[in-house]
Amino acid sequence: MKILLTGATGLIGTEVMKTLAAAGHQVTATDRKDGEIPPGVEFILGELTDDNFVNSLDFNVDAIVHLGSIPQPFDDRDFEVFDNNVSCTYKVFAKAAANNVRVVVYASSLSIYGTAFSKPWTSPEFAPFDESLPLHHYESYALCKEVNERTADMWANRSKTAYVGLRFPFCNTEKAIEDHAIAQRDGHEETVTVAAKILWGYLDVRDAAHGILAILAGNSTGSHTYNFTAPDTTAPHPTHEMLAKFHPKTKVLRDIPGYGSLTDCSRWIAAYGYHPVHLIDRKKLGI
């Protein structure tokens, strides 16, 4: 399959690029910074903010994996985050439709629900939560994710291209996820707070990459977004205890046994059948 990958040297993109190449796909990868490029991958350095650069890319491909964006908000560049992430995504989506690309897979985020970066402490209305959880935006990163999802809807209406958005949690390497869990275990105050705000969710980048492979192998149509997380948490205590302590106002819809995730990914599993396999080893980490 001929694939265009944006954000190729970022955290998720690096693993996706490696996984796509290993699976035998013909990959053209682009990003604003250099990185380690697997054999057989064509890498093009450039900025998606530059219209001339975007126009120079070959969009005559079977699929696009769009991961190119500023990955989190900062107060001193709130507008820059929104402008970059929305305009670059619009360009890629429009080019996909114009070139009859079969499917576009793009990175959305669980931060779309508003808890991750909100200044006031914010809790989900209910848990486990599926994609129907109301969205509450407090900064431009969460807002741009919703705008991008609606942009995908529009282009799906106007073309035969399918758009699949993945609402990723904290997505990182095995080592970084382990360190995050250990810091919570050891009571590191900042990490404990951050983990509670992101609802203790995580996904290993290897699972992110194989989830994307599952989409590319499928027969997607229209525009859809999915929660996509590991089935457990990084928390040092059972989920019901963590909810009671940090999110006591959240309505618990059903029992969440043990260290089960607050995120309901059943729609994702039903659509593509991929279950994350790179899970934290609690015995190893002593949690």
What are these regions (language model features)?
Residues 3-23:
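N-terminal Rossmann NAD(P)H-binding glycine-rich loop of SDR-like oxidoreductase domains
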Residues 45-84, 95:
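NAD(P)H-binding glycine-rich loop region in Rossmannoid oxidoreductase-like domains
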Residues 82-89, 93, 105-111, 144, ...:
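Short alpha-helix in the Rossmann-fold core of NAD(P)-dependent oxidoreductases
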Residues 91-138:
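Conserved Rossmann-fold NAD(P)-dependent oxidoreductase catalytic core, especially the SDR/UDP-sugar
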Residues 113-114, 140, 158-182:
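Flexible, glycine-rich beta-alpha linker
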Residues 174, 179-193, 198-225:
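Alpha-helical substrate-binding/gating segment
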Residues 206-287:
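C-terminal substrate-binding subdomain of Rossmann-fold SDR/epimerase-dehydratase oxidoreductases
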